[in-house]
A protein has these predicted regions:
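Functionally critical loop-and-helix segments that line ligand-binding/catalytic clefts
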Residues: 146
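Cell-wall glycan-active module
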Residues: 1-114, 119-135, 140, 150-196
Length: 196
């Protein structure tokens, strides 16, 4: 793996941040905002507009996916919208560099990332993709749905039926993969949704 480079960013961003402790208290509070404040950042007019465009652009794919899996186009679109703003922010880090760094230089979760690295390399080999060309998150997540390589391996789907699974360039593949992931994790068609 002589082509892989150490990624200081991956190691730094994976390192847990210290919590905030009130004086005299044993309770450690997360330095992050509460969920509702966090979620409001996703409910912008632009994100809603882009979501509608994503649904319209992929209407035929969604028709088929809803019929075969029962997963709602709105739920799939919401997942992709939160994860990558409909493909706008899929990551700018070489996945190979991130996974190599987190496998061998970040001992806290090395076993997990070694498994992810193995899945990534196997996936690239099967799909005939050069590992150094794949970009993703600092932690190695890939494509519209930000799947880790093991998830891509298990639940990646060929939505455009071209014989390949491409979560970066193919919206149909991303849509089918998110639906497959949700179905595998207990999605029940017609059941209501809960939200805070």
């Amino acid at each position: 793996m002589a082509v892989a480079r150490y990624s200081e960013t991956a190691e730094r961003l994976m390192t847990p941040k210290p919590g905030i402790r009130k004086p005299g208290s044993d309770v450690v509070k997360s330095p992050f905002r509460n969920y509702l404040a966090y979620a409001r950042g996703f409910l912008t007019q632009e994100r809603i507009l882009r979501g509608r465009e994503f649904i319209e652009r992929n209407a035929a794919v969604f028709d088929e996916i809803e019929m075969t899996s029962g997963v709602s186009r709105y739920v799939i679109t919401a997942v992709i919208g939160v994860e990558t703003f409909y493909g706008r922010n899929m990551g700018r880090y070489r996945v190979l560099d991130s996974l190599m760094t987190l496998s061998f230089d970040y001992t806290r979760r090395a076993a997990f990332f070694k498994e992810e690295l193995a899945h990534f390399l196997e996936f690239c080999w099967r799909q005939e993709v050069q590992p150094v060309t794949v970009l993703g998150s600092f932690a190695g997540a890939i494509g519209y749905g930000q799947f880790m390589p093991s998830s891509l391996d298990r639940w990646g789907a060929d939505g455009d039926k071209d014989g390949r699974i491409d979560m970066v360039e193919s919206e149909p593949d991303a849509i089918a993969s998110v639906a497959r992931f949700l179905t595998a994790h207990g999605w029940v068609a017609g059941r209501g949704l809960l939200y805070p």
